[in-house]
């Protein structure tokens, strides 16, 4: 059985959603294994667009299965809205979805706590403030609610009371519980025990959909300016709920770099060029609509992401956005304390470095020699080949190499 993963090699927003939808046609099921509604995967079907915050980005037109694993935290409001969307677009597509009963639930009060905590920091992280970090914190403290807890309302109520005590906050437990149970009942028929899901799925071809990117991974990313989970390949097994051997790991990278929120960004452009990239690439967060910070491609960080994720195939997106630039700078290394480095072992000192660029000739067309030279140069530097090049926003605008 085929097992593959699609992960981001930067700070998220690499275009993974479109890639997953395209690749899903070769697999039986797409699995979301981490994160929550802080993700935002935009899929352009041509006649309509869909932004997946929780639902896996499977091609629903091709009737591909979707599974939300126990490593995901579920906002029931967002989930119900997305289920309605896909069902309106493709009738009966709801039946393609299964959700782990062991997935934790984001309750409304988490969003308020998330905002309060981030606002009180001396150096704000810049979270999406959707309660994701609070959900994972409560899971670690063993007081978080799981979907299966609503099968026994008294059990769910006890967890809500524990949350109130743990965070020293008061809220109407009965009102929140009644609201959550009402929403839970709307998806009850889609729930499945993680162990049962594994029995069903382990004999199928699976595509694991990563969220955010390696540089936002809670352990391997630019800590503390990271998300709350292992969104790289290290999160697949716990997020799926079963040991699984992933054979193909597709690493998705933009032809340039973007970042939402705070944190170090060595190649950031704080000038008109950066603004131009943002405009041309429509670089605004799919979840928050915040403007993304933009900069040149950073091969040092890409190498780090490849190494820490065991990526073995590359996919480039948004190369078309750079068409028309006369020169394209690529960050080939860093100067740190007067010394030159082409690789780093961690991300702790990115604020202390000076990026070193090499300029290459730009291109007017993705069919030009100049663009081919750009691709070959990156392949040589990274020691990996590109499997696909995305040539536009629509699903079909992708070339297999």
Curated annotation (Swiss-Prot):
GO terms for molecular function: adenylosuccinate synthase activity; GTP binding; magnesium ion binding. It comes from the Bacteria. Pathway: Purine metabolism; AMP biosynthesis via de novo pathway; AMP from IMP: step 1/2. Its EC number is 6.3.4.4. CDD domains: AdSS (cd03108). GO terms for biological process: 'de novo' AMP biosynthetic process; IMP metabolic process. Its cofactor is Mg(2+). It is found in: Cytoplasm. GO terms for cellular component: cytoplasm. The active site is at 13 (proton acceptor), 41 (proton donor). IMP binds at residues 13-16, 38-41, 128, 142, 212, 227, 290. PANTHER family: ADENYLOSUCCINATE SYNTHETASE. Belongs to the adenylosuccinate synthetase family. HAMAP family: Adenylosucc_synth (MF_00011). Plays an important role in the de novo pathway of purine nucleotide biosynthesis. Catalyzes the first committed step in the biosynthesis of AMP from IMP. This is Adenylosuccinate synthetase.
């Amino acid at each position: 059985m085929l097992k593959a993963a699609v992960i981001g090699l930067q700070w998220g927003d690499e275009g993974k959603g479109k890639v997953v939808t395209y690749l899903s046609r070769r697999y039986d099921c797409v699995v979301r294994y981490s994160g929550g509604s802080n993700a935002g995967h935009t899929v352009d079907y041509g006649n309509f667009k869909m932004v997946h915050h929780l639902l896996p980005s499977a091609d629903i037109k091709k009737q591909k299965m979707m599974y939300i694993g126990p490593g995901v935290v579920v906002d029931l409001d967002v989930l119900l809205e997305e289920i309605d969307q896909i069902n309106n677009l493709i009738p009966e597509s709801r039946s393609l979805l299964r959700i782990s009963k062991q997935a934790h639930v984001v309750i409304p009060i988490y969003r308020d706590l998330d905002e309060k905590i981030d606002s009180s920091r001396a150096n704000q992280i810049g979270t999406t403030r959707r309660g994701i970090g609070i959900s994972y914190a409560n899971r670690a403290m063993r007081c978080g609610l799981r979907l299966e807890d609503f099968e026994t309302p008294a059990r769910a109520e006890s967890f809500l009371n524990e949350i109130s005590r743990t965070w020293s906050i008061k809220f109407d437990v009965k009102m929140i519980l009644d609201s959550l149970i009402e929403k839970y009942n709307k998806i009850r028929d889609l729930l499945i025990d993680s162990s049962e899901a594994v029995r069903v799925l382990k004999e199928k071809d699976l595509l694991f959909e990563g969220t955010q990117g390696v540089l936002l991974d809670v352990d391997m990313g630019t800590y503390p300016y990271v998300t709350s989970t292992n969104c790289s390949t290290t999160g697949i097994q716990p997020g799926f709920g079963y040991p699984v051997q992933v054979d193909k790991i597709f690493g998705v990278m933009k032809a340039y770099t973007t970042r939402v929120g705070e944190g170090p960004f060595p190649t950031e452009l704080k000038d008109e060029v950066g603004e131009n990239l943002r405009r041309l690439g429509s670089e605004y967060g799919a979840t928050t609509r915040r403007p993304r910070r933009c900069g040149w491609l950073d091969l040092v960080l890409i190498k780090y992401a490849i190494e820490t994720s065991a990526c073995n195939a590359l996919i480039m997106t948004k190369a078309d956005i750079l068409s028309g630039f006369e020169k394209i700078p690529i960050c080939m290394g860093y100067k740190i304390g007067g010394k030159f480095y082409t690789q780093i072992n961690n991300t702790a000192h990115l604020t202390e470095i000076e990026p070193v660029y090499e300029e290459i000739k730009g291109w007017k067309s993705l069919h030009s020699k100049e663009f081919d030279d750009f691709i070959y140069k990156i392949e040589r530097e990274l020691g990996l080949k590109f499997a696909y090049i995305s040539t536009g926003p629509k699903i079909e605008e992708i070339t297999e190499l």
